[in-house]
């Protein structure tokens, strides 16, 4: 069942209206995507929070800040990050401050993720949580550490029953996250999964703005391909190659 996602200013995912023209109304922003038939109009850009100051968290914050979003990078020790090279529009603060945003990305060490999201469950209620964490088996880097029948996305959704969990950015090596989007924007795909179709367009807009092409691979229960051990993990692929792997297990030429 879809959850109602309401932002602090009163903007809901339903306010992302499709319009034929690019005419702007006061207080709205039209966003055009290369593969979209019509622009997406929203009342304002959502505020972004990132939980985790490691390479993935910093990469996500950097790409979204460059795209014009206001980003709060949350960390356990904010004062220790003052010298990091980040866009000036990125604010560094505690986890609780980052969790106040409209859309929150999770990019912490997996062993810390459960305690963190449970402590922020009330703050994250009614929001979109984009889970980029990975749990891999200690005995095998390329195998999930969760049970065979449980995906990372489904596990995270069970911890946050009042949030809309989206699984994304889990299959791209951290050292390529910023460079591929910067050097070749709109070329490489990000596979994502969700159970709430009404948040997909907003998530896809964020992925486009970060320099990637969104490819939905299914529901959270179907997100094993972007978990450790999955056919897409850890790989960076074009949209056609990603779809071919998902459909046939073979890359397109």
Segments predicted by a language model, with ranges:
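Rossmann-fold cofactor-recognition segment
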Residues: 89-92
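Phosphate-coordination loops involved in phosphoryl transfer and adenosine-cofactor binding
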Residues: 44-47, 126, 187
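Rossmann-like NAD(P)-binding element
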Residues: 94-128, 133-139
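NAD(P)+-binding Rossmann beta1-loop-alpha1 motif at the extreme N-terminus of oxidoreductases
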Residues: 20-83
């Amino acid at each position: 069942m879809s959850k109602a996602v309401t932002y602090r200013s009163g903007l809901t995912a339903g306010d992302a209206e499709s319009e034929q023209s690019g005419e702007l109304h006061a207080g709205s922003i039209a966003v055009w995507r290369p593969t979209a038939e019509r622009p997406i109009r929203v009342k304002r850009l959502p505020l972004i929070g990132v939980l985790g100051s490691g390479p993935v968290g910093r990469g996500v914050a950097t790409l979204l800040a460059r795209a014009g979003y206001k980003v709060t990078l949350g960390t356990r020790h904010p004062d220790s990050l003052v010298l990091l090279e980040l866009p000036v529009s990125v604010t560094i603060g505690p986890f609780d401050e980052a969790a106040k945003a409209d859309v929150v990305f999770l990019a912490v060490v997996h062993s810390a993720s459960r305690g963190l999201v449970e402590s922020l469950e009330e703050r994250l209620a009614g929001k979109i949580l984009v889970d980029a964490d990975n749990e891999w088996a200690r005995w095998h880097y390329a195998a999930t550490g969760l049970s065979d029948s449980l995906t990372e996305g489904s596990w995270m959704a069970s911890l946050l029953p009042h949030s809309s969990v989206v699984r994304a950015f889990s299959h791209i090596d951290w050292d390529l996250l910023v460079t591929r989007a910067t050097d070749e924007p709109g070329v490489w795909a990000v596979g994502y999964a969700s159970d709430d179709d009404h948040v997909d367009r907003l998530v896809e807009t964020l992925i486009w703005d970060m320099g990637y092409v969104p490819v939905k691979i299914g529901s959270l229960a179907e997100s094993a391909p972007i978990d450790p051990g999955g056919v897409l993990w850890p790989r960076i692929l074009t949209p056609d190659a990603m779809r071919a792997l998902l459909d046939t297990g073979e890359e397109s030429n």
